[in-house]
């Protein structure tokens, strides 16, 4: 069987009795093991990430790799990366040899961590760092700041320097869609009009 984002550790007995088991992990293992591989890759300004299918063993995200697919993530939002990987996997799964000998994971091991609400705050950040967090956390967060004394979640932004903006420490951010505290998703321009 294949599992994805199962967030559980199988017992050795379960693995033995149900072998082979495979996991799809949304990074190019052994890089970005753990719960937030897509967000961490974007947060760290990686240009490429992808997904890995590996044989499940008793340790977390360490089994032999049977397939990897590299994708360009430069400038993308996490939700776009998830969609890109999902679409790629739907095609690739038809041609994956699940019974070949896997490759042992070596070198470049890195781990991810769980992100919390404070991680999504862009209030005191530079423009570039705020944009990075908005892209990395659009699915998990989203990024937010205090604006007119309320929490304003920023879903995305424009690179075009036109329209209404929010002043950050070193530049202007041009939000497109926001979620004001206690309200639904709306255009930033509509929010400003009240």
Where are the language model's segments positioned?
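Donor/substrate-binding cores of folate-linked one-carbon enzymes
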Residues: 2-114, 118
């Amino acid at each position: 069987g294949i599992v994805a984002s199962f967030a559980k550790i199988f017992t050795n007995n379960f693995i033995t009795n149900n072998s082979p088991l495979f996991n799809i992990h949304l990074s190019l293992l052994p890089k970005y093991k753990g719960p937030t591989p897509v967000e961490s890759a974007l947060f760290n300004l990686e240009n490429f990430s992808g997904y890995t299918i590996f044989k499940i063993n008793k340790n977390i995200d360490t089994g032999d790799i049977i397939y990897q697919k590299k994708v360009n993530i430069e400038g993308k939002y996490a939700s776009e990366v998830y969609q890109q990987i999902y679409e790629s996997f739907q095609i690739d799964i038809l041609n994956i040899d699940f019974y070949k000998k896997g490759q042992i994971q070596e070198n470049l091991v890195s781990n991810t961590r769980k992100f919390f609400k404070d991680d999504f705050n862009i209030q005191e950040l530079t423009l570039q760092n705020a944009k990075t967090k908005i892209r990395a956390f659009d699915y998990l967060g989203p990024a937010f700041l205090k604006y007119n004394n309320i929490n304003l979640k920023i879903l995305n932004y424009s690179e075009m320097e036109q329209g209404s903006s929010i002043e950050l420490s070193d530049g202007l951010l041009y939000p497109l869609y926001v979620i004001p505290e206690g309200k639904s998703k709306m255009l930033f321009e509509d929010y400003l009009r009240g």
